[in-house]
Regions:
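An aromatic- and histidine-rich active-site surface loop
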Residues: 86-131, 135, 294
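Donor nucleotide-sugar binding/catalytic pocket of nucleotide-sugar-dependent glycosyltransferases
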Residues: 127-128, 152-196, 205-206, 213, ...
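Membrane-proximal helix-turn-helix segments that form the acceptor-binding/catalytic region
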Residues: 99, 144-162, 256
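Short hydrophobic beta-strand element within catalytic cores of glycosyltransferases
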Residues: 285, 304-311
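Aromatic "clamp/platform" in nucleotide-sugar-dependent glycosyltransferases that forms part
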Residues: 291
Length: 374
């Protein structure tokens, strides 16, 4: 897949530059975790790996600095902008720098694909993981949707190869490029076979006595319906834990907080992976309300932890979770699925077994990373 550019010197290592994330070591989302895993894997296989990292500063001093972490070059780009402008500044500066360095350019996401024009003019090999169909998300206004739609087209045509993380995304990309230019490679997760109880108890929870949701607090992730369905009736000593950053300046976030009540625990975003793994492992079930996107990393990680999943019924989640999940379409059906999960131990056990089997079948890191290298 990566097909390294032929080194000018036979003893040189093949090279790859990874663009499109905030950087590694991972402390944010799925793309950062993936970039870290792929970088370590390829470095261990003899590749020269560079990963671009974003650093926000008040005033740009030294625009580009390079450090080494576990055999990987961390190429840090200073940006003085904030918000969306910071992302655009970072993406553009990454492209300018990458054009001067040898190696395949692996771009994660297409939100700044317009800048890839410069890499093509410099005759660089570009492979882009196209992520989800961002412009379809209802949270965006017309201008943002137009920007994402345009960049999706540009990214599809400027990249020599496209990677889809889900068959439905591959089908969508096939309306942009020939199938021969598209590879389908999912996301990976490590199996979780044990986890300490202390991180769970530190949040005032009892193992097996809570449901958990880990997602951005956004309408298309159904966070508010999940809370409303859970609180529709008395759940006894069962709790709901919702992980995600809340900003009370955002109306939807205020509505979520107001709906939570005392039986919904909202600790914010937690980036400590040991704590997150423990919360998944000891949960009665994992709540997954995502309605758009491809293979969601959090859902894959729930399967690898052996979670029974209660998921929104759509083609993305159906392909990922399969028989490991029970599905809902609205608040009424979600409340009913919660009833089933709390009442039926045998159902939970069957779904948990199916979750681990599905994770082994389709989402092993070794298989995912090897597919990228090929």
């Amino acid at each position: 897949m990566l097909k390294p550019e032929r080194p000018s010197n036979p003893i040189e290592k093949p090279s790859i530059l990874i663009l499109g994330t905030r950087g590694i070591p991972a402390s944010h989302g799925g793309f950062e975790t993936f970039a870290e895993r792929l970088a370590l894997f390829l470095a261990g296989r003899g590749w020269k790996v560079g990963v671009y990292c974003q650093k926000e500063v008040e005033r740009v001093g030294e625009r580009v600095t390079i450090d080494t972490w576990r055999g990987i070059e961390l190429i840090t780009i200073e940006v003085a902008s904030r918000g969306p402008r910071a992302t655009l500044e970072f993406d553009w500066q990454c492209v300018l720098d990458a054009a001067r360095r040898p190696g395949v350019c692996l771009v994660l996401g297409y939100n700044g694909a317009v800048f890839l024009t410069w890499l093509r003019l410099m005759r660089r090999r570009i492979i882009t993981n196209m992520d989800g169909i961002e412009w379809r998300r209802p949270k965006w206004g017309p201008a943002a949707r137009a920007w994402f739609w345009l960049n999706e087209w540009i990214g599809a045509w400027l990249s020599q190869r496209l990677i889809a993380d889900h068959p439905a995304i591959a089908d969508h990309l096939a309306t942009r490029r020939p199938r021969s230019a598209i590879a389908t490679i999912a996301y990976g997760a490590d199996p979780v076979t044990s986890a300490p109880e202390e991180p769970v108890r530190a949040l005032g929870l009892e193992p097996g006595k809570y449901l958990v949701s880990i997602a951005r607090i956004e309408p298309d992730n159904n966070i508010l319906p999940i809370i409303e369905a859970f609180r529709r009736r008395d759940r006894g000593d069962m709790k709901l834990v919702v992980l995600g950053t809340l900003n009370d300046e955002i109306p939807y976030h205020r509505a979520v907080r107001e709906a939570a009540g005392t039986t919904v625990i909202m600790p914010g975003a937690i980036y400590d992976q040991a704590t997150v793994k423990a919360l998944r492992y000891h949960a009665r079930a994992y709540m997954h309300g995502h309605t758009v996107g491809g293979t969601n990393p959090s859902l894959v990680e729930a399967l690898a932890a052996g979670n029974m999943v209660i998921a929104h019924d759509n083609r993305y989640n159906r392909w990922v979770a399969g028989e490991a999940a029970i599905y809902f379409n609205d608040t009424d059906s979600l409340s009913a699925r919660i009833d089933e999960a709390l009442a039926d131990d045998a159902l939970v056990a069957r779904c948990s077994k199916a979750a681990r089997a599905r994770a082994r079948e389709a989402f092993r890191w070794e298989d995912v990373l090897s597919a990228y290298e090929k």
